[in-house]
Structure formats: C-alpha cells, structure tokens
Swiss-Prot record:
Designated name of the protein: Divalent metal cation transporter MntH
Source organism of the structure: Staphylococcus aureus (strain MRSA252)
Single biological process term from Gene Ontology: iron ion transmembrane transport
Gene that encodes it: mntH
Record carries keyword Magnesium: no
Bilayer topology: Multi-pass membrane protein
Length: 450
C-alpha cells in the first residue's frame, strides 16, 4: 500500500450527512455516548439480514444448541473488524472505499471497486428476495410485484434523509427492536431448556469432529461478516461534529463510536441466537432437512403440533413480519453502502435519487429476470439467495485486506494505528475467514450440483 497522504480536495464521504450531528467533546460522558448512539444500529441491521436466517434456524433444528458457540465467535470477530472501520473513518476522514481507491494503484483499485459493487448487489438481492417473500406470505402479493415494490424504498429513504440522518437511525432502530421483540416472544412460547441453551455457548469437540456441524458452524462464522458493513460504518461515523484536526476529540469519537458499535452488535448477536434457539426448541430431532427456505420455515411454524393451530398461525405471521422488517432495515443500509462505494471509488457526482435508484435497480433486475425465467418458482428464487451469499464470501477478503493494511499504517492513521496484538488477531482472523469462505464456496456448489 502506498503511503500517499490524504488529498485535501477529497470529497467528503456521504457529504449530505457528514459532520451534521452535534458532538460536544466538553459535555458529560452520558451526553457524548448519546451523541454517538446510532451508527452502530445501521451496522447491526446488516448482521441480522435475511440471508443469515435460514443458516441459524436450520443449524438449531439439525444440531440443537451446539452452534451457539459459533455464533459467539462470529460476533466477537465482527466487533473487532467494525472497531477497525470506526478508527479508519474517524482517524483519516476517509471511508474504506475512498481509502482503497486513494492508496492502491488504479488498476487494482478498479478491480476492488467491481468486486465491492457486486458485493453490494449480492447483499441487496438477499434483501429484495426476503422482502418480496415476506409480502407474499403476509398479503399474498406476487413475488414479482413484491420485488418491484422494494424499489420504492429508495424514494422513502430520500424522503426521510431530508429530515436528517438521526431519523434514519431511529427508523432502523425501530425495525431492529421489532425483530428482537418478535423473536423474544417466539422463543418464550417455544419454551427452550435454559441449561441446554447456556451449554451451547461452551465449545464442543463435535463442532470439529462432525462434518455436518462444522459446515454450518463455518457458515455462521464465515457468512456473518458482511462486506457492505465495513464500507458503511467507516462512512457514517463521520456524521458527528468532532474536530477533524484534534487528536483528543478524535480519540473520544473513536471511544464512543466503538461503544455504540459493540452494544448494537450485541443486540444483533441476541437476535441470531434467538433464531438458532427457536429452530432448536421447535424442530430439533424432527424433519430439519425440510427447513431449507423461508416458505419451509413459515409453514413449519404454522403447522408445528406443539404450538397448536392458533399459536402456530400467530408465530408464522410474526415470522413474516420480522422478515419484512429485517428486509426493510437492510435495504436502507445496503442502499447507503452502495452510494458510499460508488462515490468512494468513482467520485461520481450524480443526484442522490439517481445514484440510489441505480444501486437498487441493479439488485432488483436479477430477481425480476429469475422470476420471469422460473415463472415465480419460490424455490428457485431462494436458490438465488444462496448464490448471493456465496458471492459475499468471495468478496470478503477484498475489503478485509485493505482495511487491515490501512489501519496498521502509522503514516495514515497517526496515533490510532493498530497495536501489535490487534494486528496479530486481525491477520489471523482474516486468514481463517478467507479459508473458511473458500471451503464454504466449494461445499455450496457441491450441494447445489448434488
């Protein structure tokens, strides 16, 4: 990585929200914390995306609570990587996309941009599919119409942005807590064994010795870190009004932004654990192999004998509501991440509505095409979701490695560069995640061919 200095005429990351939310470094710690409470919510939404739902619930249904430990490891890994993006954004005034373009040679940066754009599209595809399926389950809206409806999210986002970024944070927070409370209720109704749940957070040798458990554990760990979240977080932490030239204020901003991130990621961790616990408590030792998609999960909840007809109907409906909320939540964050990547790599100066419409259209079009080709076949559309998750695995090293190189660069980061122990852990994590994702890609294609 070149040691070029940050250009003074570099366009601000998400300039319409950059440096717009008040942060007074002289205020109380409580006020500072409240000032920085918000960006982590948008990031947490990405860790609760619909693409991870099936893995969690199917893992619980097949192997009980054993995989809760894998969930814990994935969340601790996410906390470390997101804290690095926080430091990058605040210390340098650049987001990850800008940094990659600015400090890598142009040909390499272009390759990284293409992969980043495809990763954003892959993320968005999962949300479009999840939202379209939720609308179909709740209101019997055809999938193709549901996919087209998701385009309207772009204009809703533009409308809300007029009233400030805090409104976006509040809406995302509302959606996250909607999902959280739905699954708290569903897990309560499913009556899991508390001792068995707690025991699931202890590592078991089965995770390594049982190929089936290992595969899903790798899926939980490897697919949890979302590329778009790294671009997103490095940008939106710059929405606060700390001094860009005062290291003391930067240090405070990093401290409270990291606290915010860790709290919100803990909430996402709870949600993903609840999904796994729900799958384990209702479907363990049953026909877990039949829980391959959202429709399967919906109908399994609806017809589960333990719940009864009335409660089964309530549980399945709430599941669809949570799926819709999760899709809308991730739609907002995915659209913003798409804008960050496009601006950061290309320096495009086009109207916000057009930029966001392009980002969303690139995700909706493949879904629409597949719906037409497969005549609305839900199983085929859910298979497209699997392919989108595979591509995210491919794309992950292309944002993790620049992040690691940048945050360990003293000339770039100043006093906020990675300490030796952070470098050791992060490089180890990056290597392991990359190996896991290669393994997942191979296994996924073997399953699809089989």
């Amino acid at each position: 990585m070149n040691n070029k200095r940050h250009s003074t005429n570099e366009q601000l990351s998400l300039d319409e929200i950059n440096n717009t939310i008040k942060f007074d470094h002289r205020s109380s710690n409580k006020q500072k914390f409240l000032s920085f409470l918000g960006p982590g919510l948008l990031v947490a939404g990405g860790y609760m995306d619909s693409g991870n739902w099936i893995t969690s619930m199917q893992g619980g249904a097949q192997y009980g609570y054993t995989l809760l430990f894998g969930n814990l490891i994935s969340r601790l890994s996410a906390m470390l990587l997101q804290s690095m993006t926080v430091r990058l954004g605040i210390a340098t005034g650049m987001d990850l996309a800008q940094m990659t373009r600015h400090y890598l040679s142009r040909p390499i940066a272009i390759i990284f941009w293409i992969i980043a754009e495809l990763a954003i599209i892959a993320t968005d595809i999962a949300e479009v599919i999840g939202s379209a399926i939720a609308l179909n389950l709740l209101f019997n809206i055809p999938l193709i119409v549901g996919a087209l409806i998701t385009v309207l999210d772009v204009f809703l986002l533009l409308f809300i942005m007029k009233y400030g970024f805090r409104k976006i944070e509040a809406i995302v927070g509302t959606l996250i807590f909607t999902v959280l409370f739905i699954f708290i209720f569903e897990v309560y109704i499913s009556s899991p064994q508390l001792n068995a749940v707690l025991n699931g957070f202890i590592p078991h040798s089965e995770i390594i010795t049982n190929n089936g458990i290992l595969y899903i554990a790798l899926g939980i760990i490897g697919a949890t870190i979302m590329p778009h979240n790294l671009y997103l977080h490095s940008s939106i932490v710059q929405s606060r009004t700390y001094s860009r030239h005062n290291n003391e204020e930067k240090a405070q901003a990093i401290k409270f932004a990291t606290i915010d991130s860790n709290i919100q990621l803990s909430i996402a961790f709870v949600v993903n654990c609840l999904l796994l616990v729900l799958g384990a408590s209702l479907f363990f030792n049953s026909n877990a192999d039949d829980l391959g998609g959202f429709y399967d999960l919906y109908h399994a909840l609806k017809t589960e004998p333990v719940l009864g007809a009335t409660m089964g109907a309530i549980m399945s409906t709430l599941f669809a509501v949570a799926l819709l909320a999760s899709g809308q939540n991730s739609t907002i964050t995915g659209t913003l991440a798409g804008q960050i990547v496009m601006e950061g790599f290309l320096r495009l100066h086009i109207p916000n509505w057009l930029r966001r419409l392009i980002t969303r259209s690139l995700a909706v079009i493949p879904v629409i095409v597949c719906l037409i080709i497969f005549k609305g076949n839900a199983a085929k559309i859910e298979q497209l979701l699997v392919f989108s998750q595979v591509f995210l695995s491919i794309a992950l090293p292309f944002c993790l490695i620049p992040l690691q190189l940048a945050t360990s660069n003293k000339d770039l980061m100043g006093p906020f560069y990675n300490k030796t122990w952070v470098n050791i852990i992060s490089w180890t994590l990056i290597i392991i995640l990359s190996i896991l994702n290669v393994y997942l890609i191979v296994q996924t294609f073997q399953e699809l061919q089989g």
